[in-house]
């Protein structure tokens, strides 16, 4: 334990570590959460001369939007959808531009495009919600089921796989609970979902020197002569790397959640994720989805940390270690679209290379003849990869030190 604390203090004393933590916090929390809520994500846009085209009044807009959504009764039915669309068209006709900003028009418009494609007027430059006849918006859940079936057929998900996904979907409570959706859509679609990708960059910078830095700093001789030996020191370094990963995640996650609670409160936590993507099959509400996404980031970051430390132990050069580490995450993202679909799914299992937004998709894996929903593997396989890298890191470090 003493060695661990020494290594932990040694890591945090480095100026580059403090700079990385600060930059990561500024990017993910200040810009990615606080300013996104208050300014360029939800600020009103009547003043197009302001930065990002938005005003610095996101808090007020969010509260007004939540209050407006509550006026529709809390359940999403045909009548609710008709009322939402009719109300939007009336406000637009009355020139109430500011009032339109508190509506869920982007979400509702996506529903219309998905469920009522025959009502789309290609000659009309306006969005569907502006011109569609509200009286024709019937059969919401029947149409959703039809669209889901068609999507599965087109995706080649038939037979046992289709039935497996239908069994999941049947657990989704209907009618859907409805409150303001746009905030949760942004939160789950980008704010939390992108956290891991950003963390990977800074984890790579910090942890790449954990082992390789000993050669640069000419401390390898000291390690050889210490009474503790390479084995205990290697373990202390690995535990330090994992501890730093958890600490960085905790700093970002706790700060982001506090920001979220300040701006959005808890309103809408029990809405189904189907309000964001209609053909999602997971029986999850917004809170459960957020917990999953944070778990995805944490476990993926731990897995990635294990890989970085293994590379650092095997490679003497800091820069090469960093480049190889970043290639693990960003490489699959760059080449995935050029690979077969099954290969893309396999690459998603690499720590932080996949996406927590798979909860909105219908991807599955077949392992030993058993179908498994992809999000389950996306939070378990990455962390196991990181753990399995530990003995290899120690072995690589040992081989180099003895040489």
Feature annotation, model-predicted:
Residues 21-25, 319-332, 350-351:
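Central hydrophobic cores of alpha-helical transmembrane segments
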Residues 26-83, 133-214, 235-314, 318, ...:
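Secretory targeting signals
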Residues 5-7, 11, 310-314, 381-403:
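Junction motif at the cytosolic side of a transmembrane helix
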Residues 343-364:
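Short hydrophobic, aromatic-rich alpha-helical segments embedded in or entering the lipid bilayer
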Residues 217-221:
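Hydrophobic transmembrane alpha-helix segments characteristic of membrane transport
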Residues 224-230:
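Short helix-to-coil transition segments within interhelical loops
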Residues 1-23:
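N-terminal Sec/SRP start-transfer signal
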Residues 18, 231, 318-320:
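Residues that define the loop-to-transmembrane-helix transition and helix capping
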